[in-house]
UniProtKB/Swiss-Prot annotation:
Record family assignment: Belongs to the TPP enzyme family.
Pathway, per record: Amino-acid degradation; Ehrlich pathway
Pfam families found in the cross-reference section: TPP_enzyme_C, TPP_enzyme_M, TPP_enzyme_N
Reported uses of this protein in biotechnology and industry: Fusel oils are important flavor and aroma compounds in yeast-fermented products contributing to the quality of beverages and food. In low concentration they are generally desirable, whereas high concentrations may spoil the product. By adjusting growth conditions and substrate their production is sought to be influenced.
Taxonomic lineage of the native organism: Eukaryota, Fungi, Dikarya, Ascomycota, Saccharomycotina
InterPro entries attached to this UniProt entry: DHS-like_NAD/FAD-binding_dom (IPR029035), PDC/IPDC-like (IPR012110), THDP-binding (IPR029061), Thiamin_PyroP_enz_cen_dom (IPR012000), Thiamin_PyroP_enz_TPP-bd_dom (IPR012001), TPP_enzyme_TPP-bd (IPR011766), TPP_PDC_IPDC (IPR047214), TPP_PYR_PDC_IPDC-like (IPR047213)
Cellular component GO terms held in the UniProt record: cytosol; nucleus
Annotated catalysed reactions: 4-methyl-2-oxopentanoate + H(+) = 3-methylbutanal + CO2; (S)-3-methyl-2-oxopentanoate + H(+) = 2-methylbutanal + CO2
Record's protein name: Thiamine metabolism regulatory protein THI3
Organism of this sequence: Saccharomyces cerevisiae (strain ATCC 204508 / S288c)
């Protein structure tokens, strides 16, 4: 007979609410907690060590901790962040806001002053000095799907369960304030023997039936269809349903930049990355001439709509958002898309399909190899690195050139992409890399036979300088990511897009990047500085380099005014937009026109490199 949870952990009849909280996270296989300690959070953190499977990451600052919880959540379904009242939570709020914008489930627990001090409105440290202890809670409410304070002894266990469920199901941050004098509120441990109910709410059967009928009708009639997979496919755990739908329909499949890594890019139906009007010609051709388009996990950001200068030509579109569906001109709110897709799959009859499958053209166009002594360029690097990726890789790309360059790659099967294309907080990926490393460590341990996911980070030198402290935490835990520092001597994307390319605010202080691992006390590492095509080829062809048995930092030396092709394409859209502004206002001087040093680059990249 299987023992109950309380028996396995030999729990007494009553436990503290803080113990209960950590046991609930343990039950969901959430084993790493991120954050920084503080006077108001330390009593809570003491309880963390009562649960054998949990560990405290101990981040370098709260912002990086929020980034790490976000990266962890993208693989595990939920990230937990603990900060102290006021100064700590405000340091983290940028990262939490990013999780809200990008639909990532975070449980943010804030250690608060005792309720007695709050009632008396004492002028405690970490307050604004006005006796208002609710101000930070109010600030958090705008970047959380739910907020609460653990103050009622009769309801506190229900509140803990509610917070975890909301963060898990809605994939948005939840704010939980816990005063220091409430940490030991007694709770019956027997509640832990009943698992959390994480079932999605059932759809209205009549509405669901109508939506399914209309979508299937379009599917059966369509002769030139397309499927576009967007960000919320991974956020709402729709990957398996999407995979089955693509396999059975055999429609042409595309991903948005935020959806990259959610479908099998080695499948013959995969056609590439859809970025609105700046998509590759072969992608535009399919989408523009489609008579029916399904967008799964829809998030209409500027990166998938060419800065909102693109609309689907066909009106026969099924836009499947996180919790609603737009079908032509009709909107159906309050729908679970996961349950809807499952019902569509259950009712799908492939014999009724009108579409005749055809293989999509390869997005990887063979290019002549430059000589080995040729200096590296973005365009060549991003095309070449695809050959080094392996199934199961976690590929993280920073806001900037890397976020555009990765769209030129083709991922192997079961590869996940992590980026922050919508919120775009520069420096996010160092913390996200830490969180992803913790997550894959736990996933590898839980799987049999064991897998060995590699975590690969591409980060510009400017972004690296913003959040470098978390490299110390990576070293502390002996984690083994690949960190590619794309050194183009400053903020090249901004330098390229803005009309003043020579402004000093693009520049940064040069660092000895490869010396930092030694500074942080690392002993198991490898560093490389790659300048030429030959050095790059030699590196990725080395079988030892392919094994993630140590932390590796690779500095890729690039020209300061060199950018990926996808960014050049975006510039064309920006130029047209600026031209329209100029026509509307002849006195306007803020026109994005490339300076002379970019003209040769435009011509060179347009013919390939």
């Amino acid at each position: 007979m299987n023992s109950s949870y309380t028996q396995r952990y030999a729990l007494p009849k009553c436990i503290a609410i803080s113990d209960y909280l950590f046991h609930r996270l343990n039950q969901l296989n959430i084993h790493t907690i991120f954050g920084l300690s503080g006077e108001f959070s330390m009593p809570l953190l003491d309880k963390l060590y009562n649960i054998p499977n949990l560990r405290w990451a101990g981040n370098s600052n709260e912002l990086n901790a929020a980034y790490a919880a976000d990266g962890y959540s993208r693989l595990k379904g939920l990230g937990c962040l603990i900060t102290t009242f006021g100064v700590g939570e405000l340091s983290a709020i940028n990262g939490v806001a990013g999780s809200y914008a990008e639909h990532v489930g975070i449980l943010h627990i804030v250690g608060m002053p005792p309720t007695s001090a709050q009632t008396k409105q004492l002028l405690l440290h970490h307050t604004l000095g006005n006796g208002d202890f609710t101000v930070f809670h109010r600030i958090a409410s705008d970047v959380a799907c739910y907020t609460t304070l653990i103050i009622d002894s009769e309801l506190c266990a229900d509140e803990v369960d509610k917070c975890i469920k909301k963060a898990w199901i809605e994939q948005r941050p939840v704010y939980m304030g816990m005063p220091v004098n409430q940490v030991n509120l007694p709770i019956e441990s027997a509640r832990l023997n009943t698992p959390l109910d994480l079932q999605l709410h059932k759809n209205d059967p009549d509405v669901e039936k109508e939506v399914i009928s209309r979508i299937l009708s379009f599917i059966y009639k369509s002769q030139n269809p397309a499927i576009i997979v967007d960000a919320c496919t991974s956020r709402q755990n729709l990957i398996e349903e999407t995979k089955e739908l693509c396999n059975r329909l055999k429609f042409p499949v595309f991903v948005t930049p935020m959806g990259k890594g959610t479908v099998n890019e080695t499948d013959p139906q995969f056609g590439g990355v859809f970025t609105g009007s700046i998509s590759a010609p072969e992608v535009r051709e399919v989408v523009d001439f489609a008579d029916f388009i399904i967008v799964i996990g829809c998030m209409l950001s500027e990166f998938s709509t060419s800065t909102f200068h693109f609309q689907y030509k066909t009106k026969n579109c099924a836009l499947l958002y996180s919790t609603s569906v737009k079908l032509k001109n009709a909107t159906y709110p309050d729908l679970s898309i996961k349950l809807l897709l499952q019902k569509i799959l259950a009712n799908l009859d492939e014999s009724k399909l009108s579409y005749q499958p055809s293989e999509q053209p390869s997005m990887m166009v063979p290019r002549p190899y430059p000589a080995g002594n040729v200096l590296l360029r973005q365009e060549w690097v991003w095309n070449e690195i695809s050959h080094w990726f392996q199934p199961g890789d976690i590929i993280i790309t920073e806001t900037g050139a890397s976020a555009f360059g990765v769209n030129q790659t083709r991922f192997p099967v079961n590869t996940l992409g992590i980026s922050q294309a919508l919120w775009g907080s520069v420096g996010y990926t160092m913390g996200a890399c830490l969180g992803a490393e913790f997550a894959v460590q736990e996933i590898n341990k839980d799987k049999f036979p064991a897998t060995k996911h590699r975590v690969i980070l591409f980060m510009g030198d400017g972004a690296f300088q913003l959040t470098v402290q978390e490299l110390s935490t990576i070293v502390k835990w002996g984690l083994t990511p690949y960190i590619f520092v794309m050194n183009n001597q400053g903020y090249s994307v901004d330098r390229f897009l803005h009309h003043r390319s020579d402004a000093s605010y693009y520049d940064i202080q040069p660092w000895n990047y490869l010396g930092l691992l030694r500074v942080f006390g690392c002993t198991n590492y490898e560093t490389k500085k790659i300048i030429t095509v030959g050095e790059f080829r030699s590196m990725i062809s080395d079988p030892n380099f392919a094994t993630n048995d140590k932390i590796r930092m690779i500095e890729i030396m690039l020209p300061p005014r060199d950018v990926p092709q996808a960014l050049l394409d975006r510039w064309v859209v920006e130029k047209e937009q600026s031209k329209q502004v100029q026509e509307e206002n002849e006195n306007s001087s803020a026109v994005n026109t490339p300076t002379p040093e970019f003209q040769p680059l435009l011509k060179k990249n347009q013919v390939g490199y």
